[in-house]
């Protein structure tokens, strides 16, 4: 999206194995700026299947483990990159061995550097990350229901759910 809008951007994070290599090659072929931390484990894949009647099935592999050295390298790179950007977008679930507050740490670093942190994640990671007050979150209907415990079946219940969690 940033590329299409002619905005400056850089994709970063963790990539490893054949899938990571494939993704980096595709990004390069499509002239998408990137600078990833190489990890020892294989990057996971996520496959979404939509049937003609609109039902969706998601096949989601478990994510790779990230070791302390890889995490430290990323945090160093992230902190350096903060001097070149105004907005950070973090998206997706965390690798299973990173702490639930990892996005919170990234939010704190962004805030310290007067940058806006936008977050698209779900579940306990989202719940934990809210404690750090990211500038923007992008929960979908299911994620709002999970976060608030309120079943959303109309615009009114949607508003009620949001107001109950974010008065």
Q: Residue spans of the language-model regions?
A:
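Short beta-strand segments
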Residues: 13-14, 37-39, 48-50, 60-62, ...
């Amino acid at each position: 999206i940033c590329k299409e809008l002619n905005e400056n951007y850089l994709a970063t994070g963790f990539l490893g194995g054949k899938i990571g290599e494939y993704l980096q090659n595709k990004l390069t072929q499509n002239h998408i700026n990137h600078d990833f931390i190489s990890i020892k484990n294989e990057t996971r894949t996520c496959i979404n299947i939509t049937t003609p009647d609109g039902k969706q099935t998601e096949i989601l592999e478990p994510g790779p483990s990230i070791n302390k050295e890889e995490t430290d390298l990323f945090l160093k790179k992230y902190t350096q990159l903060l001097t070149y950007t105004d907005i950070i977008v973090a998206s997706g679930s965390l690798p299973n061995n990173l702490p639930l507050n990892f996005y919170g740490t990234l939010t704190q670093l962004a805030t310290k550097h007067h940058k806006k942190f936008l977050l698209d994640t779900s579940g306990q990671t989202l719940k934990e990350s809210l404690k750090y007050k990211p500038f923007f979150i992008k929960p979908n209907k299911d994620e709002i229901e999970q976060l608030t415990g309120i079943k959303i079946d109309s615009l009114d219940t949607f508003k009620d759910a949001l107001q109950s969690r974010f008065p």
